């Protein structure tokens, strides 16, 4: 299957002049200046701060202090394009895109113009947002929270969309994948409550997080088989989970686990200089997810 996906990507790229051009993003767009660092921040902000509105001001300050060039956001509940634009202005981003206004929207902001916006709602629980900025195609990811079968279909749809991009495209996948990496399996295997927790969760929510009573690692494996690089894993010194934080200690949230990732195509991963989960006292009380960050240099077009 993964070989087919990679072949399809080449076929789509070659077919651009023959009628697939409407699906391809325009070439020659402005990129970051050579030598400049390019920083991405990805953050699931838990129901758009509707549950804990007092955390919003701290969140805006945190993002501003991080000084990202591009931001991938999940769970922008109750947001409008104007509301996202106001947030983006707080961290000096004049450009922003909201996927939708209902349900659990994703959003994207940038210090540079955003082009090639592609919104896909069909086939995805929360939708898929694709944008281009700084010479990079960025997918804002938020996969299904409670069903491994649906997540697998979403991954396949994501890879089909990826196949429509030019062969040499630099691509990032950033967001809340709601699933597990084989790189973290040794940590999860040592947890006495990981499987029992998901059994409780699936029973409570009528979900399907477990496949045959076990964690399902196939989703991210398919991305890596297609050539994507897990940047956090590549740069980290040890495991850090991105969920849960200390914000919901009164709830049964299960053991810490990594749900938030940034994946890059090899041509972009080669310029990655840093990638990390931002776990500290501040981020522990802003949302139920910790943010993740990646930095690239040189960021050439």
Show where each model-derived region lies.
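Active-site beta-strand/loop signature of hydrolases that rely on acidic residues for catalysis
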Residues: 38-45, 59-81, 138, 158-188, ...
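Structured beta-strand-rich core segments of catalytic domains in phosphoester-bond hydrolases
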Residues: 73-153
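Short hydrophobic/aromatic beta-strand or adjacent loop that forms the aromatic wall/cage
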Residues: 103-106, 124-130, 256-261, 288-293
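Active-site beta-strand termini and strand-to-loop segments that position acidic
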Residues: 109-111, 129-134, 265-266, 287, ...
């Amino acid at each position: 299957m993964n070989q087919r996906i990679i072949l399809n990507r080449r076929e789509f790229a070659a077919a651009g002049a023959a009628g697939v051009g409407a699906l391809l993003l325009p070439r020659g767009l402005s990129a970051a200046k050579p030598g400049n660092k390019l920083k991405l921040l990805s953050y699931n902000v838990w129901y758009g701060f509707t549950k804990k509105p007092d955390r919003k001001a701290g969140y805006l300050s945190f993002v501003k202090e991080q000084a990202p060039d591009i931001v991938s956001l999940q769970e922008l509940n109750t947001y409008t394009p104007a509301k996202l634009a106001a947030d983006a202005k707080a961290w000096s981003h004049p450009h922003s895109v909201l996927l939708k206004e209902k349900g659990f929207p994703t959003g994207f902001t940038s210090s540079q113009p955003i082009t090639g916006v592609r919104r896909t709602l069909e086939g995805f629980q929360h939708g898929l947002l694709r944008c281009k900025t700084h010479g990079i195609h960025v997918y804002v990811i938020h996969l299904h929270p409670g069903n491994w079968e649906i997540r697998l279909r979403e991954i396949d749809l994501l890879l089909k969309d990826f196949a429509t991009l030019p062969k040499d495209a630099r691509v990032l996948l950033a967001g809340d994948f709601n699933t597990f990496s084989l790189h973290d399996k040794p940590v999860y295997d040592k947890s006495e409550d990981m499987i029992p927790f998901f059994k409780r969760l699936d029973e409570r929510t009528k979900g399907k997080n477990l496949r045959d009573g076990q964690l399902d690692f196939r989703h991210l494996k398919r991305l890596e088989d297609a050539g994507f690089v897990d940047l956090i894993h590549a740069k980290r010194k040890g495991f850090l989970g991105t969920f849960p934080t200390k914000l919901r200690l009164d709830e049964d949230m299960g053991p810490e686990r990594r749900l938030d990732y940034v994946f890059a195509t090899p041509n972009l991963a080669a310029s990655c200089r840093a990638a990390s989960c931002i776990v500290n006292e501040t981020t522990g009380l802003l949302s139920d997810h910790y943010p993740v960050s990646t930095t690239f240099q040189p960021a050439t077009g």
